[in-house]
UniProtKB/Swiss-Prot annotation:
SMART domains: ACTIN (SM00268). Its EC number is 3.6.4.-. Keywords: Acetylation, ATP-binding, Cytoplasm, Cytoskeleton, Hydrolase, Muscle protein, Nucleotide-binding, Oxidation. Belongs to the actin family. The keyword Acetylation applies. It comes from Manduca sexta (Tobacco hawkmoth). GO terms for molecular function: ATP binding; hydrolase activity. Oxidation of Met-45 to form methionine sulfoxide promotes actin filament depolymerization. Methionine sulfoxide is produced stereospecifically, but it is not known whether the (S)-S-oxide or the (R)-S-oxide is produced. One of its GO terms (cellular component) is cytoskeleton. This is Actin, muscle. The keyword Cytoplasm applies.
Amino acid sequence: MCDDDVAALVVDNGSGMCKAGFAGDDAPRAVFPSIVGRPRHQGVMVGMGQKDSYVGDEAQSKRGILTLKYPIEHGIITNWDDMEKIWHHTFYNELRVAPEEHPVLLTEAPLNPKANREKMTQIMFETFNSPAMYVAIQAVLSLYASGRTTGIVLDSGDGVSHTVPIYEGYALPHAILRLDLAGRDLTDYLMKILTERGYSFTTTAEREIVRDIKEKLCYVALDFEQEMATAAASTSLEKSYELPDGQVITIGNERFRCPEALFQPSFLGMESCGIHETVYNSIMKCDVDIRKDLYANTVMSGGTTMYPGIADRMQKEITALAPSTIKIKIIAPPERKYSVWIGGSILASLSTFQQMWISKEEYDESGPGIVHRKCF
């Protein structure tokens, strides 16, 4: 299977970034934003080869004249036409492969509507003529990537966060919790609190600038109240950021107020539990005998877990919730941004996985519903 001409393709379609590459590789070959941009203005110059839509990095670089749309919201594909464009771009422009020659492993968030994966299956077989495909749960792949068979994964990306407890390779579906609070909500929140400082960010293109500020300057405070006091008393926490037009803005307590919303969703006006409580609640829904193993193997994955300080804060918060004698270990591998993709690469190249693929023949025989029988 490791031979490049029949290597399986692994495509992790995140709400924010699409990660794609070949099974057996240790990192995705293509990582680009899951965006489709359409011009906001009329084209006037003939022969410029203007397109009616742009995908990924090209959309990002021309964002000043485009309206950018994300076809995946909260981990669910909401715009199938745009999603097809992204897949088309992935196969033909990024990986430069013929999709009808390679099996494809796709990923999705747990507790997604069933129709979502049926439609994914249908498009892969009918539009792209894939020989075989499989849909895997994102958090399960992250656990593969960390080399464990038992643990609880907190996977937090751009659109959705979820906690999935897995014991000896079995996911425990009754204890899976999903939180529709993730990176994109934090970007929106940062846009809002920067407005209070007098910086106005409103368009879809400016939102991308704010996302960059968030990724470069934000961090999670170990003690929020104390950090707020420090920020108020001195300028030691202030950092400056240069906008594309050369203007320099300064941000202070926004740096940690933004990701704090992960632990206090009330900042966003949401009535849900923070990520630490979600992990705890998920563990408490599991059998009493396996909780100890889950506390000791709490794996973080996804781009929204990349903030400096998040693992220490998580350790502190869960220690406060859990019984005092229990050992708590938060595993935050440095490559966790891509651990879903890496897990997919591992899974698709296992010899034992080869009989798990849904083949074109099986699809033709049973229709899209087969995906629920063959994929967890």
